[in-house]
């Protein structure tokens, strides 16, 4: 790699660290099959990428954006948040064949519901206990 090429690139991208990142990204793009904008002249991809940057034949802001996207670990997507109330409504729609416990028909059909008239069969008064004691004395 010629020193002249790097010095020409520093005029386009003053920060040498950023130059290395951008030139590396362009070299990876060339390896992936991107079209060359200068003649190869039997040079390797990093040298070709530096020559392209020095000549100004590549779009440097696009290369910088590609570097940023390549280094990102987590891409945050703005999605609307659902309320708990909306999620409950969705649960009902997702289970059309399953009856929910909140339905009155389901509560009556389960056989475990105590109705108002069911208590009348039981005699819970105190005289019921006395009748059994009197029967024992006889």
UniProtKB/Swiss-Prot annotation:
The keyword Lipid metabolism does not apply. It holds the Pfam family RNA_pol_Rpb6. It is an enzyme of class 2 (transferase). GO terms for molecular function: DNA binding; DNA-directed RNA polymerase activity. The keyword Amino-acid biosynthesis does not apply. Residues 101-138 are annotated as: Disordered. Keywords: DNA-directed RNA polymerase, Nucleotidyltransferase, Transcription, Transferase. InterPro entries: DNA-dir_RNA_pol_omega, Pol_omega/Rpo6/RPB6, RPB6/omega-like_sf. Residues 119-138 have a biased composition (Acidic residues). Its EC number is 2.7.7.6. GO terms for biological process: DNA-templated transcription. It catalyses: RNA(n) + a ribonucleoside 5'-triphosphate = RNA(n+1) + diphosphate. GO terms for cellular component: DNA-directed RNA polymerase complex. HAMAP family: RNApol_bact_RpoZ. Promotes RNA polymerase assembly. Latches the N- and C-terminal regions of the beta' subunit thereby facilitating its interaction with the beta and alpha subunits. Belongs to the RNA polymerase subunit omega family. The RNAP catalytic core consists of 2 alpha, 1 beta, 1 beta' and 1 omega subunit. When a sigma factor is associated with the core the holoenzyme is formed, which can initiate transcription. PANTHER family: DNA-DIRECTED RNA POLYMERASE SUBUNIT OMEGA. This is DNA-directed RNA polymerase subunit omega. The gene is rpoZ.
